[in-house]
Curated annotation (Swiss-Prot):
Family matches, as SUPFAM superfamilies: His-Me finger endonucleases (SSF54060)
Name the record gives this protein: Extracellular ribonuclease
Species annotation: Bacillus subtilis (strain 168)
Entry GO terms, CC: extracellular region
Coiled coil: none
Taxonomic placement: Bacteria, Bacillati, Bacillota, Bacilli, Bacillales
Length: 288
């Protein structure tokens, strides 16, 4: 028998018996969708480090941020402001449906994930009663007194679903470390003038505030929003605490949930991006 004659039957036997199946299986595993990876990861966070295959980039961000690379300080801040300004603005009522998509539970499409508690709650329970979720302004809307009209008050890059009672407890506090644990939201702490969110969203909070401080510079009829290193800012257009936010940006890296949310906002709703999700290192370049 020739070598070719006995080799082909042997390959067939190996395929049938499953000896070559692992290679095919491994190849198939790399085709999992982002939703599959999010749903299968702990708490749906889906860190890139925990994925067997890295997530493909969403958009051509090199083109989007053209002109920003290599800049630092005020030059970088002003360039990013120009890039992300002029976005499509939603009404406050339109925010409800947007959040139902941007913050959808990857394990249950009928629910949203609440920011401070990580609870999955029905999309239909949006409102103002106990047991409902409502629209949390991460940059407190009293800090600059911009309310809920189109603009910073409806910018979904910093609006997130939150339990009504937890949202009320946070109020308009600045962000800082320490305080007493809030019983209705374990892992969150508060004192007289500050709120500390749970560890898994500390970076999310920081990057949302970085975005707001770059997007709203007072040149388009909206307040000039700025970070500072204080708490108790009240109605001034400032939010703190800058040094703590920079620490949180490093402690809680960007995850796939943030990336997916950023992409949905860019593609479907506002058509602008949060630069600090795409390039978290830029925060230290602007606020050294």
């Amino acid at each position: 028998m020739t070598k070719k004659a006995w080799f082909l039957p042997l390959v067939c036997v190996l395929l049938i018996s499953g000896w070559l199946a692992p290679a095919a299986s491994a190849s198939a595993q790399t085709t999992l969708s982002l939703n599959d990876r999010l749903a299968s990861s702990p708490s749906g966070t889906g860190s890139l480090l925990s994925l067997a295959a890295p997530a493909a980039p969403y958009a051509d961000t090199d083109t989007y941020y053209e002109g920003a690379e290599g800049k630092t300080g005020d030059s970088l801040k002003s360039t990013l402001h120009r890039i992300i300004s002029g976005h499509t603005m939603l009404s406050y009522s339109e925010v409800w449906n947007a959040l139902k998509e941007t913050d959808e539970d990857p394990r249950n499409p009928n629910n949203v994930i609440l920011l401070y508690t990580n609870e999955s709650r029905s999309k239909n329970l949006n409102g103002g009663n106990v047991g409902d979720w409502n629209r949390e302004h991460v940059w407190a809307k009293s800090h600059g007194d911009f309310g809920t009209s189109k603009g910073p008050g409806t910018d979904i890059h910093h609006l997130r679903p939150a339990d009504v009672q937890v949202n009320s407890a946070r109020g308009n506090m600045d962000f800082d470390n320490g305080g007493t644990e809030y019983a209705k939201a374990p892992g969150n702490y508060y004192d007289g003038d500050s709120w500390e969110p749970r560890d898994d969203v500390k970076g999310d909070v920081a990057r949302m505030l970085f975005y707001m401080a770059v997007r709203y510079e007072g040149d388009d009829g909206y307040p000039d929003l700025e970070l500072n290193d204080k708490t108790g800012n009240g109605s001034a257009p400032y939010h703190g605490k800058q040094s703590v936010l920079l620490e949180w940006n490093k402690q809680d890296p960007v995850d796939d949930r943030e990336r997916k949310r950023n992409e949905i906002i860019y593609e479907k709703y506002q058509h602008n991006r949060n630069p600090f999700i795409d390039h978290p290192e830029w925060a230290d370049e602007i606020w050294p």
